[in-house]
Design a protein with these regions (language model features):
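Short, small-residue-biased leader/transition segments that mark boundaries at the very start
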Residues: 1-12
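N-terminal capping/linker segments that flank leucine-rich repeat
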Residues: 3, 15-170, 174, 179-222
Length: 222
């Protein structure tokens, strides 16, 4: 993890160049503020998450993932260097203007396709965007919820590995798990030997079943 302040200069650009083991950037600012995040994420090609978490607050205000991308450089016969980028991570890193995040542009990328991306990172991107929905419109929520509902197991694997019970509660609160997802989650919790997670999943499934509308029965006497 790395904690960052609002203003980040060339020293940070040099510090994070070619960094491949970074997981989270902790930004001590509100997501709508101008920060040095653009400089950081554009010098990190691996997947990284920026968490906007102000001191004294119980939860982050936003968690934005920047998936990995690859840059290829080819020299043409005319000795012109041609740069090509693979992976949506490059496009996510361009969603800034004057140091501020362009949330609408960021959210517009996901529906364009993510089949070639790390599906675990894509699932976490959806999860974090939904549980900390800064500037998230109802229209933008739909593709995130759809993808997350189909890949809850990938998120649970990460959360169980981290023993992050609070985040498991956040996932359950989004109400995206169906019967198959609950069954997969129970199996993952058992494999991880995590009784607390298993209990949370069982309780959430029981409540969901209990809240489902019951079919009406009609009795006819002839």
């Amino acid at each position: 993890d790395s904690s960052t302040s609002r203003g980040l200069g060339d020293v940070y650009k040099r510090q994070f160049l070619n960094c491949f083991a970074l997981a989270d950037l902790l930004v001590r600012a509100a997501p709508e503020e101008k920060t040095g995040l653009f400089a950081l994420v554009n010098n990190i090609t691996e997947a990284v998450r920026a968490m906007f978490w102000l001191p004294g607050e119980a939860r982050p205000r936003a968690g934005l993932w920047y998936p990995a991308y690859w840059e290829d450089v080819e020299e043409s016969p005319a000795h012109i260097l041609l740069h090509t980028f693979s992976g949506q991570g490059y496009h996510y890193r361009q969603c800034f203007l004057d140091g501020k995040i362009l949330s609408a542009e960021y959210d517009a990328i996901f529906p364009d396709g993510h089949a070639a991306e790390d599906q675990g990172v894509a699932a976490m991107l959806c999860f974090d965007r939904l549980r900390w929905p800064w500037n998230l419109t109802e229209k933008a929520k739909a593709p995130y919820r759809e993808f997350l509902a189909a890949h809850t197991g990938l998120v649970l694997q990460r959360l169980l590995k981290a023993q992050d019970t609070d985040s498991i509660k956040d996932l359950l609160a989004l109400d995206v798990l169906d019967a198959a997802a609950f069954a997969e989650g129970a199996a993952l919790a058992a494999k991880a030997d995590n009784a607390a997670a298993a209990a949370l999943l069982a309780d959430a499934e029981h409540k969901k079943r209990g809240s489902a509308p019951k079919k009406r029965r009609y009795d006819f006497d002839f």
